[in-house]
Design a protein with these regions (language model features):
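Polytopic transmembrane helical bundles with strong interfacial aromatic enrichment
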Residues: 2-182
Length: 182
């Protein structure tokens, strides 16, 4: 029994470490997209040099940190469920968490698509739209952390209202930042 508990704690620790790495990669990746997009509207020499550098940085960040962290997050998360499936698979908060994780995985792959579009100069989004895209990952982080920490003590009505309030607050902050920059 001690080995199972110790094994679970190690798996849980690794899961948390790779969640942190995954989110760090997603946050920084979209930040690179914003800089990359802004560089694409600059003078030709600057655009060429900076775009090439951003492409290298994006490629390394995506394939060395972000995507492996996603895979390991899912692997260790699934391992935790296997080790304690009697508990996790009966918990409503876990079902909702898994839904958010699925949406986060879709966000991950759409972010990869954005990377290819921006590198081919086909992305039609503005830097402000990319900032809003970046805040969506923040919403996933807030939702997942609150679900895991508060579990069933969370009043779902307050949780839902709070989730949308955070989203609205982030949108307002991005809009204010845009006005401040102008």
């Amino acid at each position: 029994m001690y080995f199972c508990t110790m094994s679970f704690d190690i798996v849980k620790s690794l899961h948390i470490i790779f969640v942190v790495c995954w989110f760090a990669g997603l946050f920084y990746m979209v930040r690179l997209f914003i800089y990359h997009k802004e560089a694409q509207i600059g003078p030709v020499d600057e655009k060429t040099i900076l775009s090439k550098q951003f492409e290298i940085m994006e490629h390394k960040l995506w394939w060395i940190i972000t995507t492996p962290s996603m895979v390991l997050t899912v692997l260790f998360g699934a391992w935790m469920i296997v080790l304690n499936h009697e508990y996790y698979l009966t918990q409503p908060w876990m079902h909702l968490k898994l839904l958010f994780v699925l949406l986060l995985i879709l966000y991950h792959f759409f972010t990869q698509r954005i990377m290819y579009l921006i590198q081919s100069e086909s992305l039609r989004w503005s830097s402000t739209q990319l900032r809003l895209w970046n805040e969506l990952a923040t919403l996933f982080l807030v939702a997942i952390v609150f679900l895991v920490v508060l579990k069933s003590t969370l009043n779902w009505l307050y949780g839902t209202v709070g989730f949308f309030a955070v989203g609205l607050g982030l949108m307002i902050a991005v809009r204010m930042y845009k006005r401040f920059r102008s």
